Amino acid sequence: MLIGHTNIKKRDLVLDIGAGSGVITSALSKRCQKVIAIEPDKTALEKLRKNTKNLENVEIVPEDFLMMDLPETPYKIFANPPFHLSSKILHKLIEAKNPPDAIYLILQKQFALKLLNTDRHYTSQLGYALTAKYQTKIRYPLKPYDFTPPPAVPTVLFEAKKI
């Protein structure tokens, strides 16, 4: 599982942004102290509640992540957000009063490359802002068959760890 490619530990608080049906949430619950599963969609919420009802360390927040307050205690992010929201999510995280200790996002590869501070890739303004606070890298390339339905573009597990 992808979570094995992270530094998420048993003592961690982890936010799952856009938790959907709870596949990632359920896996995270086995690896960390508490998962906050954030999901605004009512249909997905029903599935999420059903799939996580026996997981005592999961808290479901039925809100839009972009509108909610972030924790004041240390936390990490692991999410498979809609690609069109990736930039807004990262902006919110790095501009937060208490930014996360680590960010793990499943991203479109082309977008993730712009977040790296390397000589080989054009780094975006967001990438420069991110790399001022975080060490960034592509943790793991993903295959289309890792998803249902498969994405139309190459995807990666992106990591940003606080410097």
For every predicted segment, state its role:
Residues M1-I163:
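Catalytic cores of RNA-modifying enzymes
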